[in-house]
Amino acid sequence: MIAFRFPVKTLTATRLFAEHIAQAYPTQKAILFGSRARRSEHDEGDADVAIILKGAIGPFIKTKMAMNDITYDILLDTGIRIQPLPVWEAEWAHPQNYSNPYLLYDIARDGIDLASRFNEF
């Protein structure tokens, strides 16, 4: 894979998001996926971030909506819209049991662990 530097706004927004999520949820990791991870994003495109959560599988919609509340403040601060995807560690470990296993396969293949990129600041 060719190394590249993320745009500062993307790093700022995803770092803020990951920090806020880690304060609210037991988080294993945050993974950027989709167009920003593939470097094919548009100026107005969102940043898709999978949040791998520790513990028992919880209520998806309730968790996603709570994460969306956090993303709104980050949008106002950075101009970057984040689309969170909560995934529990059991789902991540066994994607074949997830409602959309191919999405998790794609994230595992193309996604970028954000913790490894935050040192670019």
Q: What residue ranges belong to the model's regions?
A:
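Glycine-rich beta-strand-to-loop/alpha-helix junction loops that act as flexible
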Residues: 33-35
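Short glycine/proline-enriched turns and hinge-like loops at secondary-structure junctions
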Residues: 42-45
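Short beta-strand->loop micro-motif that forms the acidic, two-metal-ion catalytic signature
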Residues: 47-52
